[in-house]
């Protein structure tokens, strides 16, 4: 693959910052970031060219082998872990999930640093033919390229840069890549939580936004509520009194839970789907409904689960059987003083050494993240969106990353690992 002429990032940055008081970027890191750019694009092409939907076990096996091989070549101690045995099983959880790649690099220092991303996508087998990897101008397109194959590529080449610099001042540098993120990480969540608790800092490499480049310190938590009502069928015209109307009971349950949202705390619960009956002239024997729940604090999970379990006991029709299932699909990621301090350090690097703006959002927004699992049992900083700037996640024909964001993100990620290892990011 041929690439246009590249100037070293250091030269461009120094020109941009001429006459300012900003610190000059590290010439060695900047030079390596420029050198790694074409190699990272090659890695992206390899990753995108393997279909790896969350339920495509063959594809996930192929891509996990590829990823494992890359980290072995970089000198890591690599494990392929089957997460299925300890899965948190939800209604849509498959019997088996893709393997987790864990690569461990031992250093000479004390700090333990965890880098995470995911290899699975939302796409089904055969869709790659409609959107193969390609580069058009400053955009690299491909299925899953932004969410989250770029994250794998960025981590891979950060590790490569550290190896080339012979940097080993960390105690342990761990890479964790799972294959079930797009289905709420039912298998990998327990491992991610344990690993988060064992490390001094967690950097997650979901992609950043194109128009608003910023790190995420907080995301909303996601839960679901499913109601199943069993009644008794009967003829709606000649003998409705002999039936038990599951739809009536379902409607009652939905209405009595319609006020559980709490704007003051950001808790949201909305009933969004329902199904009942098969014929107009038959009293429905079954009915189901589902609600979407969003929370900003882990403690709100406990509160809303307790509330729905209390409300469901108040039935309209005693003869109906009501079952409720509350599924914690993703916890919220909550901003902490530690994550704010680490984000401020990253912002300083971006501004003073690269001359680029970088936001840090500590207000929860958007979808869930595996970083939230990593933060559940730790007080260490956990930050999301260290990946490339991109757009079109979950889009079958428009998903891309910005090629020009490769060098800055490689520079930032490498500097952050080095500074965390040296204890420079805490304030």
Region spans (language model):
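Acidic/histidine-rich catalytic neighborhood of metal-dependent amide-processing enzymes
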Residues: 144-220, 262, 421, 425-427
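Metal-dependent amide/peptide-bond hydrolase catalytic core
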Residues: 24-28, 52, 69-77, 207-212, ...
